[in-house]
Amino acid sequence: LSFDLITEQTTLHEQRAGKNSRGLLILVNGMENSGKGEAVKALTEWMDARYIKVHATMGQHPSRYQPIWQRHTWQLPRKGEIAVYFGNWYADLIRYVFDCGDDIDEQRLQQMIEDIEAFEQDLVNNNTDIVKCWFSVDNKTLKKRLTDEEPDPEQLYHLDWFRKKDVKRFKRFSSKLMGLQSSWHHIDGQDIDASNIQFANVVLAALRTMNQLSAANDAQDNPAKTDKSANPKNDENPIKPNPLPFKPTPLIGELVSVESHALEKADYKKQLHSKQHILAELIRERGQRHIIFVFEGMDAAGKGGAIRRIIAPLDPREFTIH
């Protein structure tokens, strides 16, 4: 699954400069403690995290003076990019429902839903595909996870998940929304491992469809180029080999003679787990300050592996990779 995801992600990224290239926006919504964060974390581990941007916003009461989606437009992905967006405009929609309670203006609610649908269709028409995933669990599982030591850090909808009345209202509205919009993928969060795989497969299917569509449109726009690539003998200007031999530049000794600090596998895993835990705590205590880690060096020198080990204990909403 990871290999397939990276293959499609690489294809998407390599097509970013093309006329028919597309971006992918993944909207993540649903119940608290239903496995949303775990699923996105697994996705970033199975793919190249450099080309996935993860955003999260808290639900706000929608303004009457601008479209409900207006404040979220800066999180949209560019061509060749993948963006995962927790909360998003649906968190604002749910916030409106709970703020209004029994005095909800059904006409305004319907208008906001129609505005969202029009905006999403406009994104698709302008080469940004959308995958919408709704996570849910039953009440028994929710109650158990709410008493766990590490609950979901993002209270996206500003509601009390310990109150049965709030949970019932949330489920009632989510059922209504699912009935109005058939574009949602329902992710069952009862089994975390299974929901991670289900979510990843939904993303994989979307990437494959996007890449196939881009390739088909490229072939339609450039039939001559397609014919030449299939028949290289027809190329009017074949690439000529360089007559000069390749001469590698001498490297500084410190770059090729790195001092080795080998560890036993058991010691390595123990130290790694301990230091990852300390690092995660320090990062979460930074307050409003930003922390920047800069990696530089030779290809295949371990930069990517080091980055993966640093982000492993973190929530995808806590970091961005450039």
Language model segments and positions:
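Glycine-rich phosphate-binding loop of ATP-dependent small-molecule kinases
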Residues: L1-H322
